[in-house]
Amino acid sequence: MQNLRHAASEAFQRLGLKQRHLGYEELGELDGVEKPQPHWFHTLQVRRLRVQRGRSNSDPMGGKSFQQEFQWKTGLQFGNATSYLNLEKLGEGTYATVYKGISRINGHLVALKVIHMKTEEGIPFTAIREASLLKGLKHANIVLLHDIIHTRESLTFVFEYVQTDLAQYMIQHPGGLHSYNIRLFMFQLLRGLSYIHGRRILHRDLKPQNLLISYLGELKLADFGLARSKSIPCQTYSAEVVTLWYRPPDVLMGSTDYSTALDIWGAGCIFIEMLQGSPAFPGVADVFEQLLKIWTVIGVPTEEIWPGVSDLPNYKPEWFLPCKPQQFRDVWKRLSQLPYKTEDLAQQMLMMNPKDRISAQDALLHPYFNTLPPPLMHLRDTVSIFKVPGVRLESEARDIFSPSRRTKTPLAPLAKCW
């Protein structure tokens, strides 16, 4: 296994890192110019940059004034660790730590995902997979990989900096989001899924923490560490994917022969969570309890309803009391306050049989989105929906991006390292 990891590490060094570093010119939409931001947002950034920071061995600003360290330099290049400064830690995960940083090349805020490598293990496979996939994905609703820095001690991915994630956004706006904002978020989520599914890529880890939200309301898919290309010669996949609450019943019952329907179920759960203000199927203990939550709503599957379900390893209908399918609006009360097409889309995304679930491309054409401006349906992949005149987020009951709101309740720290 160690030899295999070392071989993968060497291959990764040859994969795009050799004499080539991603520049902003290659990334399509940046052109070296920051997107316009509200004047108060710029002020907020400046104030945060002025905060005194203590010295740290891992802090590149330790021992020097900010004015000395933070300056644009013409000689700096992409792929160089000295081209970026850490500002603050955003989160920590299983194999990586994410920092908010700034580029000394052009002054752009960035997110630095630092993966510390153990000599005997080399680069984690999840990092190799994430980098290889993201280098080929250029879409407005997928987090942008700017640069890759590879040293003996660490591997750093330099991403565009996005202000928060959907989990934190929902925490700041309890009780469900504005119905129009949900429509915009769902359109962007499905747009991103349609893009990767069209390239035979499954995300496999959809959850609110992995959906980044900018101050404009741009939603971006992040954390492709579990993503996998279906073009890789492999007939089955691991069943240990997707956080339990967003895992579809076929995977919970042990299926390893899944497709894009896996991501659609997760997106459907997120849809309900944005509407309701709480998770759709909040299991606590284990797979059994998670299945019980699902069967209570959509019923226990049978061969008549779902041909082949009895062949799944964890299909144990005798463990559950017979349950009949319920109307979604009876389970999630907010649906009863909205047009039927909202419930219809949710039902098509949360179908029991994965073969019956709607595709991301078809979901974008669902009547639920008919009230959005028609030009949204014809945008280039790299163009944000907020480039269309009149498309903007509505104010939530508690608007985290308004100046007055920020003075009362600071944005909660990121709970997940993506």
Swiss-Prot record:
GO BP of this protein:
regulation of cell cycle phase transition
Q: Record's family?
A: Belongs to the protein kinase superfamily. CMGC Ser/Thr protein kinase family. CDC2/CDKX subfamily.
Q: Which PROSITE patterns did the record assign?
A: PROTEIN_KINASE_ATP (PS00107), PROTEIN_KINASE_DOM (PS50011), PROTEIN_KINASE_ST (PS00108)
Question: Where is ATP annotated to bind?
Answer: 90-98, 113
The record's function comment reads: Serine/threonine-protein kinase involved in the control of the eukaryotic cell cycle, whose activity is controlled by an associated cyclin.
Q: Active site: which residues?
A: 205 (proton acceptor)
Cellular compartments per GO CC: cytoplasm; cytosol; nucleus
Q: What is this protein called?
A: Cyclin-dependent kinase 15
Q: Which cofactor does it need?
A: Mg(2+)
Q: Where is the Protein kinase domain?
A: 84-369
Q: Name one Pfam family in it.
A: Pkinase
- Gene3D superfamilies associated with the record: Phosphorylase Kinase, domain 1 (3.30.200.20), Transferase(Phosphotransferase) domain 1 (1.10.510.10)
* Keywords carried by this UniProt record: ATP-binding, Kinase, Magnesium, Metal-binding, Nucleotide-binding, Serine/threonine-protein kinase, Transferase
One MF term in the entry's GO annotations: cyclin binding
Question: Which species expresses this protein natively?
Answer: Danio rerio (Zebrafish)
EC number(s) for this protein? 2.7.11.22
**Catalytic activity as recorded in UniProt:** L-seryl-[protein] + ATP = O-phospho-L-seryl-[protein] + ADP + H(+); L-threonyl-[protein] + ATP = O-phospho-L-threonyl-[protein] + ADP + H(+)
* Annotated InterPro entries: CDK, CDK15_STKc, Kinase-like_dom_sf, Prot_kinase_dom, Protein_kinase_ATP_BS, Ser/Thr_kinase_AS
